[in-house]
């Protein structure tokens, strides 16, 4: 008997603002417990339950093949494809076996590896082709652009490397396989493995977040309009090539997490699960409630057992078959609220507990986190939530929803707003420190300057906002340009302060580390179906005559500095927030991090009060290696001196420069 224990929520102890909602939190916790009990009948674990991918769909057996599908609204189902010359034949009709399930068993010789097939679904008012809901391999015809399921039964992939340990502080490289090539084309899993993984390893990232893996009909959706939740995208290669990519990353000590889409489904009916069995309510909400008015997609009904089973099985499938180390859940805000949080300012705790909250979605997310930890206790889960839902990144056994981290989405907004609305001499150091560290004490976050969202067409990356047109003709090391100098300097400082003040982890989108120019624009009718802006120009980072190369080296050394000196192992302590001088300094462990954001002023013998000791510079943004001006003497050591009952460092701080100093010797020089 696997009955979930009844526990009391501990959230109120962590957040006193939740005291008026103590009973609501307890009900939420109890709801998840009872839902798990209902799903498992108290006879098994969530992991035992989440095996839909092993039951439904097409599977090889000792006797031949078995195919099963859930379609309670259907009156007849047929398999058809290469094996039937694409004709609907009675010998390939499925049999109803109860509870809305259908089944057919076929001799081994009927199907061969690589054959294409579909479902013909018949319901009371119509009939149409469908792809199986649990299909694990889908391909698209080059000419007709029609999608079909594919029989996929290759030799089993042999895993070579053990799973890496969970990073305490994920330094995440957000990547899209398809647009990772230098060439104007769709890249592949194999090319990514051969050319991009070594770059990521050299830069020092310990986690890769792979986007657009779940199959999606429209390449330009960036992978966020999913049709086939169990099928890795055919565009990039075979499932085994994806396995090899992940296996190779594991051999480098890098974790790989999936950007999983459980917030909605593409509305396409032939390719996806919209109106799958002729109804619009098998996995999604009925009617308007099931339509996302902004995304134009289908919204899951998390109160349905079929939906919970489908989505939980999906998580187990990706973890067990492909060895993903965790998930970044996209669109969590959209899941948690019936209005999807659209245009809403979350200003009151009442908004987290009113009738707009989809409690079924909260329950699903809680069960999802329980499941993945049953499968692997050191799994990594991240929530993309802009609402600030309490308990999002808090253990389920203590009343939380269970994620390890939530995305700190306000930081990216802060940087955009700052660059758009304030001149450099209007930056506020106290506000900057607060914005970088603003979070609930009980939750950890993933900080980032910009992710893929800021790079899309219609928006601008931060460096493009700062340098604009000069990125095309003034990034040469042989060209002097004040706008470029400012942009290069601030690009380094903004990324360093975001990373060194993060509370849990850090994320960067592929190419932004070196200030990739321009925007992302996937092939579409409006751009002549061009891949010109759906690629990454790695040659810019590799060309030492361009300042992109210095930004790339700075990103590498910044990450290695943070890891080697264990900066993130202790909380930041503010040492200086001088608004007039635009100087910000703080301590993390044995390191002191100092920023001079002033656009013009450099300071000699600037006082920073800190712990007594002898310090050495371990990172200097002004180093010529990073296309700085070399005004800081990194060979010096800095010894604190007593001053007015404290200990102080006297530092030379050039304008728009940051330095990281590490204590190399403890001293007791204190007044």
Each predicted region: which residue ranges?
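Active-site beta-strand termini and strand-to-loop segments that position acidic
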Residues: 61, 440, 586-589, 651-653, ...
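Conserved, mostly hydrophobic/aromatic
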Residues: 69, 119, 175, 200, ...
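Surface-exposed beta-strand/loop patches in extracellular or lumenal glycoproteins
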Residues: 67-71, 77-81, 598-614
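Substrate-binding/active-site clefts of carbohydrate-active enzymes
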Residues: 139-140, 157-167, 172, 176-357, ...
């Amino acid at each position: 008997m696997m009955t979930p224990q009844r526990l009391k929520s501990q959230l109120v102890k962590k957040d006193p603002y939740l005291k008026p909602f103590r009973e609501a939190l307890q009900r939420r916790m109890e709801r998840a417990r009872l839902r798990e009990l209902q799903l498992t009948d108290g006879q098994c674990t969530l992991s035992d339950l989440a095996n839909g991918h092993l039951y439904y769909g097409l599977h090889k057996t000792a006797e031949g093949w078995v195919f099963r599908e859930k379609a309670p609204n259907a009156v007849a189902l047929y398999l058809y494809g290469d094996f039937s010359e694409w004709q609907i034949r009675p010998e390939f009709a499925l049999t109803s076996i109860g509870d809305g399930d259908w089944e057919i068993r076929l001799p081994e010789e009927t199907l061969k590896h690589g054959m294409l097939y579909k479902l013909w679904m018949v319901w009371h008012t119509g009939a149409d082709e469908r792809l199986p809901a649990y299909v694990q391999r889908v391909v698209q015809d080059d000419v007709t652009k029609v999608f079909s399921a594919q029989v996929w039964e290759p030799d089993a992939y042999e895993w070579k490397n053990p799973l890496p340990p969970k990073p305490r502080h994920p330094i995440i490289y957000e990547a899209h396989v398809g647009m990772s090539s230098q060439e104007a084309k769709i890249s592949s899993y194999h090319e990514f493995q051969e050319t991009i993984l070594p770059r990521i390893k050299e830069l020092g990232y310990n986690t890769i977040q792979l986007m657009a893996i779940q199959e999606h009909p429209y390449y330009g959706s960036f992978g966020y309009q999913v049709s086939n939740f169990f099928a890795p995208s055919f565009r990039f290669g075979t499932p085994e090539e994806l396995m090899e990519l992940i296996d190779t990353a594991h051999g480098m000590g890098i974790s790989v997490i999936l950007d999983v889409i459980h917030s909605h489904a593409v509305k396409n009916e032939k390719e996806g699960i919209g109106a799958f069995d002729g109804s619009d309510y098998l996995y999604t909400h009925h009617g308007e409630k099931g339509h996302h008015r902004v995304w134009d997609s289908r919204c899951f009904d998390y109160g349905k057992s079929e939906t919970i089973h489908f989505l939980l099985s999906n998580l187990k499938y990706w973890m067990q078959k492909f060895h993903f180390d965790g998930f970044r859940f996209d669109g969590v805000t959209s899941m948690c609220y019936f209005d999807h949080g659209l245009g809403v300012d979350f200003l009151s705790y009442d908004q987290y507990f009113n009738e707009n909250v989809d409690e079924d979605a909260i329950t699903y997310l809680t069960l999802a986190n329980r499941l993945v930890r049953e499968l692997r206790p050191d799994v990594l889960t991240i929530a993309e939530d802009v609402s600030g839902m309490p308990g999002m990144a808090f253990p389920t056994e203590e009343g939380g929803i269970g994620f390890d981290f939530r995305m700190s989405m306000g930081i990216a907004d802060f940087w955009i707003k700052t660059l758009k609305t304030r001149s450099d001499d209007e930056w506020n150091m106290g506000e900057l420190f607060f914005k970088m560290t603003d979070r609930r004490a009980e939750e950890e976050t993933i900080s980032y300057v910009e992710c893929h969202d800021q790079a899309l067409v219609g928006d601008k990356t931060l460096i493009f906002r700062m340098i604009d047109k000069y990125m095309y003709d003034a990034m040469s090391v042989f060209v002097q340009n004040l706008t470029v100098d400012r942009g290069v300097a601030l690009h380094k400082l903004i990324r360093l302060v975001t990373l060194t003040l993060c509370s849990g982890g850090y994320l960067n989108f592929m190419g932004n580390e070196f200030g990739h120019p321009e925007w992302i624009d996937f092939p579409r009718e409006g751009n002549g179906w061009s891949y010109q802006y759906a690629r990454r120009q790695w040659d810019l980072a590799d060309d030492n005559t361009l300042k992109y190369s210095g930004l790339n080296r700075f990103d590498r050394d910044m990450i290695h500095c943070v890891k080697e000196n264990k900066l993130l192992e202790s909380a930041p302590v503010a040492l200086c927030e001088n608004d007039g001088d635009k100087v910000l300094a703080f301590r993390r462990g044995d390191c002191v991090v100092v920023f001079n954001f002033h656009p013009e002023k450099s300071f000699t013998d600037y006082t920073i009060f800190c712990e007594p000791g002898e310090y050495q510079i371990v990172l200097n943004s002004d180093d010529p290696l990073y296309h700085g001006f070399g005004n800081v003497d990194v060979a010096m050591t800095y010894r604190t001196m007593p001053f007015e009952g404290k200990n102080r460092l006297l530092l030379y701080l050039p304008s728009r420069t940051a330095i990281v100093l590490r204590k190399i010797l403890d001293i007791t020089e204190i007044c």
